[in-house]
Swiss-Prot record:
GO terms for cellular component: cytoplasm. Keywords: Cytoplasm, Phosphoprotein. InterPro entries: CitD, Mal_deCO2ase/Cit_lyase_ACP. It comes from the Bacteria. NCBIfam families: citD, PRK13253.1. This is Citrate lyase acyl carrier protein. Belongs to the CitD family. Oligomer with a subunit composition of (alpha,beta,gamma)6. It holds the Pfam family ACP.
Length: 97
């Protein structure tokens, strides 16, 4: 998936996450995480974001994650929404869990 424009998904409300995305030169990934629960879950947030980027074959992206204690499913949904808004893709491929 190619990122071609800036996009935002989510809010800064409690238990939510704001994902800001912008294109960079491939194959660079610039991931910045700001989280109220970074000490406890920072590694898990980083792993979840990078795994989703790998799944959708995303490179050349700057991601700024402002987490306010969101569950992983919320983080993934916000990231998928931002990816769609920042690319020319119309739908994401469904996956079995």
């Amino acid at each position: 998936m190619k990122i071609i424009r800036e996009a935002v998904a989510g809010t800064l409300e409690s238990s939510d996450v704001m994902v800001r995305i912008a294109p960079l030169n491939p194959p660079e990934i610039d991931l910045q995480i700001h989280s109220s629960v970074d000490k406890q879950f920072g590694d898990a947030i980083r792993y979840s974001v990078l795994a989703l980027l790998e799944q959708y074959r995303v490179t050349g992206v700057q991601l700024i994650i402002d987490d306010k204690g969101a569950l992983d499913c919320v983080l993934q949904a916000r990231l998928e929404t931002a990816l769609l808004r920042a690319s020319d893709e119309k739908i994401l491929p469904w996956r079995a869990h």
